[in-house]
Structure formats: C-alpha cells, structure tokens
C-alpha cells in the first residue's frame, strides 16, 4: 500500500472562505508545490495500485532536528518563546486547518495496519482556528508578547477541511 502525504494547499485557489471541505471537493492548486501534489494524487489514482492519500492540514509540533518556522503555529511558538510581537495580517481572520505532528505519525501507522482501507483519500486535520485565535493562545501562555493586528491584505482568508471521513474509519 502506498501512503502518500499530500497537502491541504491543493485547495489554495479557493477564493472565498470555505469550511469543512470534503475529500471529493475539486482541488484548486495555484503554486508549484500544490500543483505537484495534485498531479501526484491523480497519478496515484490512475495507477491501479493500492493507495491512501492523506491531505495534511498545517503540520505543527516539536522536531528534534529542524523545525519548520514557515508554518504559522511553529513561527508563533518561536516568537512567543522570545517575548516578541505576533503580527496578524488581515486582523488575523485567516482560517487554518491544523494537525499535530504526532497525529500525522499515528495516522500513517493506522493506515498501514488497516488492510480494508484501499484507494482512498482522507483529510488529516485536528483543529480549525483563525490566526488570531492561535495568537491568543500564545498570549495566554506568555502574557509578555504583543499582538499587532494589521489591515494588510492576504491572498485568501483560508479554508478548513472536514476530517469526518477519517474519523469514521476508527482513527
């Protein structure tokens, strides 16, 4: 069984805020990263091989070697640990689907062990929060940080994925 880690960013071209996107929603990749993931998803679907595609939300969490600080929760954690200022573009209204790294690892193991799950696509996400809510959680954990809302535009205000199909497998 091929377990392919894809990404929620295959929906980045959706212009309006959309919530609870299901796996059968038409993808709208824009940039090369999401386009390559969507292309590889389609190649797997046509291959005739047994696969599971996991569309990961923004993965966050502790890493022993190199933590990606271009992911909003990780960047906010770093800034919070340094008593810095969290800048909230568009007032922090962007919607984000988040998943902890530990859940990603657990899901890969779960899918590998489930022989009855074949040729399926699943959204792997745990929480849907606005950027402002994540910042408020950081502020609660470190009252010394500052939150600065801006009116700067963002490409889109985000979207959220539904994980109901995945949860129905017993995960």
Model region roles, listed by residue range:
Residues 9, 58, 128:
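PG/GG-rich flexible active-site loop of Rossmann-like NAD(P)H-dependent oxidoreductases
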Residues 1-30:
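Conserved Rossmann-fold NAD(P)-dependent oxidoreductase catalytic core, especially the SDR/UDP-sugar
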Residues 13-15, 62-64, 165:
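Short beta-loop-alpha junction of Rossmann-like oxidoreductase domains
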């Amino acid at each position: 069984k091929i377990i392919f880690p894809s990404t929620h960013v295959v929906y980045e071209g959706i212009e309006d805020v959309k919530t609870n996107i299901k796996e059968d929603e038409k993808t709208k990749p824009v940039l090369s990263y999401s386009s390559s993931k969507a292309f590889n998803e389609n190649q797997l679907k046509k291959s005739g091989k047994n696969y599971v595609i996991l569309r990961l939300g923004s993965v966050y969490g502790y890493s022993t070697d190199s933590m990606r600080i271009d992911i909003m929760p990780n960047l906010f954690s770093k800034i919070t640990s340094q008593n810095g200022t969290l800048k909230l573009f568009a007032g922090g209204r962007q919607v984000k689907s988040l998943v902890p790294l530990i859940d990603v690892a657990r899901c890969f193991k779960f899918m590998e062990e489930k022989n009855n799950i074949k040729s399926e696509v699943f959204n792997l996400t745990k929480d849907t929060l606005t950027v402002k809510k994540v910042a408020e959680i950081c502020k609660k954990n470190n009252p010394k940080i500052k939150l600065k809302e801006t009116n700067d535009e963002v490409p889109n205000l985000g979207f959220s994925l539904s994980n109901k199909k995945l949860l129905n497998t017993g995960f």
